[in-house]
């Protein structure tokens, strides 16, 4: 079943509203992409409005981590999800979202990109 993001077809009281038109293609949505820690990076392409393509990162093994103290960036392996400000269950399930704190080979890092929307994990190294 698809995700519908148009206006509700029922009133607060439960009665039906008078509908002057049907559903439109621009009102469809999709299920959220829950990026999980895995042994390799797996991406999938999705067609979006206007015929454009969106790259979704479904499984992640590596992150681009920037060290702000010396300005260098490295591609490092993700070991685990420590904490997630979006949902406390995400850390337990190993789901990476923007704002999550991940443990990498070089230390803890804060995720700054949206993996389900951008197809890549960018992060900032946290000071120890």
UniProtKB/Swiss-Prot annotation:
Keywords: Ribonucleoprotein, Ribosomal protein. GO terms for molecular function: structural constituent of ribosome. InterPro entries: Ribosomal_eS8, Ribosomal_eS8_CS, Ribosomal_protein_eS8_arc, Ribosomal_Se8/biogenesis_NSA2. It comes from the Archaea. One of its GO terms (biological process) is translation. The keyword Nucleotidyltransferase does not apply. One of its GO terms (cellular component) is ribosome. The keyword Ribosomal protein applies. Belongs to the eukaryotic ribosomal protein eS8 family. Part of the 30S ribosomal subunit. HAMAP family: Ribosomal_eS8 (MF_00029). This is Small ribosomal subunit protein eS8. It comes from Metallosphaera sedula (strain ATCC 51363 / DSM 5348 / JCM 9185 / NBRC 15509 / TH2). The gene is rps8e.
């Amino acid at each position: 079943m698809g995700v519908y993001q148009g206006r509700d077809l029922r009133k607060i009281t439960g009665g039906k509203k008078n509908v002057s038109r049907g559903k439109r293609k621009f009102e469809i949505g999709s299920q959220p992409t829950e990026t999980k820690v895995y042994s390799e990076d797996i991406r999938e392409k999705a067609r979006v409005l206007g015929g454009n393509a969106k790259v979704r990162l479904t499984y992640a093994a590596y992150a681009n981590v920037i060290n702000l103290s010396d300005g260098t960036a490295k591609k490092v392996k993700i070991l685990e999800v420590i904490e997630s400000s979006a949902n406390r269950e995400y850390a337990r399930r190993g789901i990476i979202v923007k704002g999550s704190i991940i443990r990498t080979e070089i230390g803890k890092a804060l995720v700054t990109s949206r993996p389900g929307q951008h197809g890549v994990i960018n992060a900032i190294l946290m000071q120890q």
